[in-house]
Design a protein with these regions (language model features):
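Small/polar/charged residue-enriched interaction surfaces, especially the RNA/DNA-contacting tracks
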Residues: 1-150
Length: 150
């Protein structure tokens, strides 16, 4: 008699491997530069700066601390940041495309998981956001300069 839950009927299906936890890459500066080189026009300077500003308060609170785990208050602020990010993505498909290519939702989801994230993870996220803003400025100015020269 075939066993249920397996496509071949030979026993229970094996569980799928869990997806790897999203981690800010060690070479996040190079990653941010490449991303902005290709996707700079997807998001405005104001929108990307606002995303950084939202993360800034959490970063400032956690950067002064020495404990390894995030405060519950910080985790709640990160959840609000995810909500704001979802709102911005819903308003503008280009922002959504940028957020997806930058993996911002995945990183924030990890940060907002109570007990699984460290202060260093938040600091890395903030530095990644700073790199995105800096390279956005660099590449948007480069493109503006090229257009004016033509």
């Amino acid at each position: 008699m075939p066993k249920p839950n397996h496509p071949s009927g030979k026993g229970p299906a094996k569980p799928k491997a869990a997806a790897a936890e999203p981690v800010i890459p060690e070479n996040y500066v190079d990653f941010a530069e490449q991303l902005m080189k290709e996707n700079c026009s997807l998001i405005t300077k104001t929108k990307i700066q606002n995303l950084l500003r939202l993360a800034c308060d959490v970063y400032n609170n956690e950067n002064r601390r020495t404990e390894e785990r995030l405060l519950k208050e910080s985790v709640n602020q990160i959840k609000l940041l995810r909500i704001r990010l979802a709102y911005e993505c819903g308003r503008d498909s280009q922002v959504r495309q940028f957020v997806e290519s930058a993996n911002l939702f995945e990183y924030l989801a990890k940060l907002s998981s109570v007990g699984t994230c460290t202060r260093q993870d938040l600091i890395d996220y903030y530095h990644y956001m700073e790199a995105l803003v800096a390279f956005h400025r660099y590449y948007s100015e480069s493109k503006t300069g090229e257009e004016n020269a033509s």
